[in-house]
């Protein structure tokens, strides 16, 4: 940590730490919310497709929102977008604790997905990526991804313990309120955004998208991430309930999700560090 601190100006260093905490909170409980699937579906008499559809919409909107939020943040500042996302996500999760109509519950996936997408680490990168050196950006991205994975590692067991001790209704409201912890952290990110900016914007958002998708390598990378995300989201959604169906304790399902996050931490650090030294295409192929 001391070596990392020496590599950055103080304002940027604290912004990186704040950004990692934002990533930890925003991804942690949203990625592990599937531990609520079985108890909620059983108590409310729903088929699992209700909960699954809501999570599917959440994942879709999370992906769609991030580039739009990043583009807006690039022009108007990351702190506004992150604040909106934190509040919107908190509202979405709170609604899940009080809306017991199947259709309305499914629709909360839109609110939560937009909120978590707007307060995800890529939005923080919009601010930090302009004030760190180009060679440091790979490391910062790896660090932020590792923080998100750490959130998943902690979120699933914590949520499961809360469900067992205070019930899923109260646990949901604690999850919702955790997103409000993001708001005071935005002070540090806004300070970094005020540092001298070496990044020059030469194209608008539409042009940037056209340029990106005209590149074969980017298109292949895009669909590679799509396939990866599809499989991981499927596992995140259904693994905890499946493990309980097989007669194991709920905490076993939670720790199964947590292990995915744990090993992703190591992978994120390793890929972020390696990306500063070795060829990124070769690393992706390996």
What are these regions (language model features)?
Residues 33-37, 215-271:
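Extracytoplasmic gate region of multi-pass secondary transporters
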Residues 144-192:
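Helix-loop-helix hairpin linking two adjacent transmembrane segments in secondary transporters
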Residues 14-48, 66-69, 235-240:
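Extracytoplasmic
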Residues 109-146:
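Cytoplasmic helix-loop-helix junction between adjacent transmembrane helices
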Residues 188-207:
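Flexible cytoplasmic inter-helical loops of multi-pass small-molecule transporters
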Residues 7-18, 210-224:
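Juxtamembrane cytosolic amphipathic helices that cap and anchor the N-termini
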Residues 64-102:
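Conserved MFS/SLC helix-loop-helix module at the cytosolic interface between two early adjacent transmembrane helices
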Residues 31, 59-67, 152-153, 261-269:
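Residue-level signature of mid-helix packing/kink "hotspots" within the transmembrane helices
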